[in-house]
A protein has these predicted regions:
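A detector of single, family-specific signature residues
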Residues: 1-403
């Protein structure tokens, strides 16, 4: 039986079913079939692949559009079988379809396009960026990725609820918000949720107020002063329960976020990338956990420029003729970029040399965000070198201070 160097598999990922095409490096398509996103569908997929591997020999390479999305857990199962996994760059795939259009458009045609991309990469080096091999990542970084994304979703939910609750409070009970500088304060939320009826808060005695968690004599005095002039709108009877429900949900979210951060702290201590990021002044636990989770492994980046583009700290040349300009890249991890922007802003306030560079960029007419990204471009070089060498950040004295 003839042997080949590789069995190539292309998967067009859908919501409930995926379209699969299996072929050889010669371009021959061996089989096409649909795969249900169920355990029995996964078993059928691997049975088909293993049958062709026994027949033709060689390794198995699997390419899928939508890695780490709707394809989960199929992508994890592919890697657990020892197959090489490639992520199809969907933007470059769209450009490929424009250059080599098909007669029609359906899932099976898209799956065959994946096999064509394999062949194109063999003969055209510039096309290798279309198929990006997925590097193995440490388990702790995979866990950090899921936990930090979960935390971010809860933080955003808390922000939405706070905005809604404050607007409802301002309408239903004018003046109540003035007793606190932040509606997210624990004592204020405990005060709101003490009773099922919002209007009863105006009649609570001082002894009852002091029994509420977080309220001492200072806050009790503020509440007592508000009670003397408390006023409720006509719709407080049905808006009040909504406010109390939102306040209780915010308390639940606070506890859930705190628990996630504690879990992240334990994983950061095990992650080499997170430890390195955490050693940079200004990059705290949350920033280090988010960046480590989104990067996964530094092995996926060929150089520091690739890392900078991925984290949104670098622009692409967009010059033509005498025009000199740049544009923002589209392949940016927005979560990693957000964590970098927060960490860099805190970093420059703690490191005088970074602050001087930031002020230099502002003096050149750059906006705050542009100056932060310019500083982040330099930090990406430092981070890439740190992670490659397994070193932590070293804060050294400036030359003029040593002299």
């Amino acid at each position: 039986m003839p042997t080949t160097s590789e069995i190539r598999v292309s998967i067009d990922v859908g919501c409930h079913r995926h379209s699969v095409a299996i072929g050889l490096p010669t371009g021959e398509v061996l089989e096409e079939f649909d795969l249900l996103h169920r355990p029995e569908g996964f078993d059928l997929f691997f049975a088909h692949v293993e049958r062709y591997q026994r027949r033709y020999g060689g390794e198995v390479a699997v390419a899928m559009e939508g890695y780490n999305g709707w394809a989960r857990p199929l992508d994890t199962l592919v890697r657990s079988h020892g197959y090489r996994l490639f992520n199809i760059n969907n933007l470059k795939l769209a450009r490929f379809k424009e250059i080599f259009p098909a007669a029609a458009k359906n899932d099976r045609i898209d799956a065959r396009k994946g096999l064509e991309l394999f062949q194109l990469c063999d003969h055209l080096p510039v096309a290798r960026g279309v198929l990006q091999e997925v590097a193995a990542t440490p388990l702790e970084n995979d866990q950090l990725k899921r936990l930090t994304r979960r935390r971010r979703a809860l933080v955003e939910e808390r922000s939405r609820l706070l905005c809604r609750m404050q607007a409802d409070l301002q309408a239903a009970c004018p003046g109540l918000l003035t007793i606190t500088q932040n509606a997210d304060n624990l004592w204020f939320l405990n005060f709101l949720t003490h009773s099922q009826d919002l209007s009863k808060l105006a009649r609570l005695r001082e002894a009852t107020l002091l029994g509420i968690k977080g309220i001492g004599r200072k806050y009790a005095a503020l509440i007592t002063a508000w009670q003397k002039s408390a006023h409720f709108s006509h719709d407080v009877a049905w808006v009040g329960p909504m406010i109390i429900e939102d306040a209780r949900r915010i308390l639940e979210l606070r506890a859930a976020i705190k628990a996630l951060e504690a879990h992240c702290a334990a994983l950061v201590a095990q992650s080499e990338i997170a430890q390195g990021i955490d050693s940079i002044p200004g990059f705290g636990l949350v920033c280090a956990a988010e960046i480590a989770g989104e990067l996964g492994t530094v092995a996926r980046f060929a150089n520091e420029g690739s890392l900078a583009v991925y984290m949104g700290m670098a622009t692409l040349d967009n010059s033509s003729g005498q025009y000199r300009g740049s544009k923002n890249p589209k392949h940016v991890n927005t979560r990693a970029k957000a964590a970098m922007m927060v960490g860099i802003d805190r970093h420059r306030k703690q490191v005088p040399e970074s602050q001087r560079y930031y002020e230099k960029k502002r003096a050149q007419g750059k906006t705050h965000n542009q100056a932060i990204r310019a500083l982040g471009r330099h930090l990406c070089r430092v981070i890439f070198s740190m992670l490659k060498q397994g070193r932590c950040y070293e804060l050294r004295e400036a030359k003029e201070n040593r002299d």
